[in-house]
Amino acid sequence: GKLLRDIAFWTMILSGTALLIIFVKAMWKRYVHLQSQIPGLEKNWVADNAHHCIASYKGSKVSLKNVRDFTWSGKRDHNSKWIDTSVDTDKITDIWYVIDHFHKIKGLAHTMLTFEFSDGQFITFSFETRREVGERYDPWLGMWRAFELYLLVATERDALHLRTNGRKHKVHLYRVQTPPGKDKALFNALCDRLNSLGEN
């Protein structure tokens, strides 16, 4: 009796260890494969991230080309519109930290930053995955960097309405307190990151 139980116990341990080794090796091969892939901008992207925004500077004025300004009537239904606009970073009045609770588990959320300007403009930055047509986002593959990184620049109306009206998510906004001049520095840093992604 005891000998058979010991044999069964160690058989289970060895089998579990073997399965774990096989799993880790498979994940490592997958990781190496994904790291060897070269990201690119010229692909058949889905409509909501079809264009990459580019920023250009002239003093405190920043010109933004390809800002998304969709009107959403559902999770996927929308009227496509991409605009070019200019903002003056000296006229930033507020920064809003946006938390999109997209899952029933409260700890899972997507975050964005919205910059409010004294001329009434609201520009939102959101780091997202860039998907090709027919490709679905998978959080597990996202952990292994299987998707191109995409910095979306959109009007706040677009970015928030997609989540509150289209996807029916709970969204919270918090005003960000920054030292003098840091709001402008943060906006410019995001634009620099935007341009660096556009060079890949």
Residue ranges and their predicted role:
Residues 2-14:
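Hydrophobic alpha-helical transmembrane segments
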Residues 13-21:
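Selective detector of the "anchor" transmembrane alpha-helix that sits immediately C-terminal
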Residues 20-41:
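Membrane-interface motif at the C-terminal end of an N-terminal transmembrane signal
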Residues 34-54:
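Alpha-helical transmembrane signal-anchor/signal-peptide segments
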Residues 47-83:
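Short extracytoplasmic
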Residues 57-61, 116-119, 181-185:
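A short, structured loop/turn motif at beta-sheet edges
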Residues 62, 73-172:
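Glycine-rich catalytic cores of cysteine/serine-nucleophile enzymes that process amide/ester linkages
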Residues 157-200:
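Active-site nucleophile-His-acid catalytic modules used for acyl/amide transfer and hydrolysis
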